[in-house]
Amino acid sequence: MSEVKTQIKPKAIFLMGPTASGKTALAIALRQKLPVDLISVDSALIYRGMDIGTAKPDETEQSLAPHRLIDILDPALPYSAADFRKDALKAMEEITAAGRIPLLVGGTMLYFKALLEGLSPLPSANPEIRAEIEKKAAEQGWEAIHQELASVDPVAAKRIHPNDPQRLSRALEVYLISGKSMTELTQISGEALPYDVYQFAIAPKDRNVLHQRIEARFKQMLTCGFEDEVKSLYQRGDLHEDLPSIRCVGYRQMWSYLSGEIDYDEMVYRGICATRQLAKRQITWLRGWHDVHWLDSEDFEQSLNTVLQVVSA
């Protein structure tokens, strides 16, 4: 009688949460307690020269707990969820091969989802079709594009705001390339993550606490030279406000200030508001997440102990 061997999956840890929730501090503490190596899951931290406005781990934090997938790309270059999944899987394999546990920490929920569930078979971007859409938008307005999308993909049109040209263009582009709606294609599952994943979400129980942290951190960034950081990017000449890097919260608002569209006080106000809106979207994602252990960022020791207990069980 032959024995059926069950393959034991390697462990991985997800530490997710909204911006300014204390993820980095907890990840560094876990690095001192567990055989983990960190992988950043953040669509802003990938860019070089964008340190202050992204709250990128500083030299001290990086020396305590080196993060992979930080500073891997110039701000002029694109980076997709598919790129992240490929890079993250490679990093996870290397960490696991060294006998350690990958600890993935960040707030870009789309990246976590792509890694956990795999990617739907969406077609690659087509510059010609994208140009046609943008030409039509220039002539008729993005509202017309939104109406066209609603006729072929009402679910996506309901989700995407008429003033969001990037997502509108992509959703319509997918249909024009494939003949199928983005909604239909995203229901097709990709390759699941071959790891035993322990998932944690950290956030304050009181949203007002998070709002206060966000405001304090944004003002601290300004004190630390955020304006000069964005000015260096602005003066390069090859970057513009439609790039994903410059659309990052804080950077977009500072860019508008440097270009003379808004004054300084308005930049601060919009930057704080945009960061709060980002945090709200991140929390909304997490509330719909399955199999996640919630941690209170106001009780650091309890959060640390909870992770240690769950992972060691």
Curated annotation (Swiss-Prot):
GO biological process: tRNA modification
Keyword Magnesium: yes
Record protein name field: tRNA dimethylallyltransferase
Binding positions for substrate per the UniProt entry: 19-24
Record keywords: ATP-binding, Magnesium, Nucleotide-binding, Transferase, tRNA processing
Similarity comment: family membership: Belongs to the IPP transferase family.
Species of origin: Proteus mirabilis (strain HI4320)
Recorded catalytic activity of this chain's protein: adenosine(37) in tRNA + dimethylallyl diphosphate = N(6)-dimethylallyladenosine(37) in tRNA + diphosphate
Molecular function terms from GO: ATP binding; tRNA dimethylallyltransferase activity
Functional note: Catalyzes the transfer of a dimethylallyl group onto the adenine at position 37 in tRNAs that read codons beginning with uridine, leading to the formation of N6-(dimethylallyl)adenosine (i(6)A).
Key word Repeat present: no
Pfam families: IPPT
Binding site for ATP: 17-24
Site (Interaction with substrate tRNA): 108, 130
Domain of life, per lineage: Bacteria
Cofactor(s) demanded: Mg(2+)
Annotated EC: 2.5.1.75
Subunit structure as annotated in this protein's UniProt entry: Monomer.
PANTHER family referenced in this protein's UniProt entry, alphabetically: TRNA DIMETHYLALLYLTRANSFERASE
